């Protein structure tokens, strides 16, 4: 990926993260949101309560959505949808602070529920990998949180 594309992606991810942080009610005073490069997670969120790193996964890309609509589709790297999700969840990132996963999508649709259910099943059966929490931030401000063995829809709206 060219450095210009990486910069555009990083700027967009910071914007999404700011919207997410606002939706869950995290104050935006005295915080810093920094983009990071591989092998670190995408975002470093610095706040007085303690720093947290976030890896972001955009669930509206055709690569991610289409296989969820038809579970039999195979990716070019021969990974199924479940394998692709597991690969993301179980990637090892270099970070000395807790890491959360933020799965986000812009538009509400029936596929949103498919994303939630497919990911929830993987997390329930296989765990969260290196992530402390898995957050879902979706169309119309729907926000869900997964932590180890519990799952909750948060009553927040963007």
Describe every region a protein language model picked out.
Residues 1-38, 57-158:
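Metal-dependent nuclease catalytic core centered on acidic motifs
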Residues 37-39, 47-50:
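A short, glycine/Asx- and small/polar-enriched loop/turn
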Residues 43-45, 52-60:
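Conserved catalytic cores of phosphodiester-cleaving nucleases, focusing on short active-site segments
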Residues 45-47, 138:
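Short acidic, glycine-rich loop/turn motifs
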Residues 50-52, 100:
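Structural motif
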């Amino acid at each position: 990926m060219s450095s210009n594309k990486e910069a555009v992606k990083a700027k967009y991810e910071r914007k999404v993260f700011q919207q997410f942080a606002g939706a869950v009610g995290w104050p935006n005073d005295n915080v810093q949101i920094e983009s990071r490069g591989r092998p670190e997670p995408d975002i470093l969120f610095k706040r007085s309560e303690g720093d947290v790193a976030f890896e972001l996964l955009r669930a509206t890309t055709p690569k991610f959505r289409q296989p969820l609509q038809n579970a039999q589709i195979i990716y070019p790297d021969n990974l199924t949808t479940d394998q692709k999700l597991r690969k993301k969840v179980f990637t090892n990132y270099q970070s000395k602070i807790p890491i959360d996963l933020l799965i986000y999508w812009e538009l509400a649709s029936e596929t949103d529920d498919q994303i939630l259910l497919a990911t929830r099943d993987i997390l329930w059966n296989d765990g969260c990998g290196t992530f402390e929490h898995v957050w879902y931030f979706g169309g119309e401000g729907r926000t869900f949180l997964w932590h180890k063995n519990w799952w909750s829809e948060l009553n927040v709206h963007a």
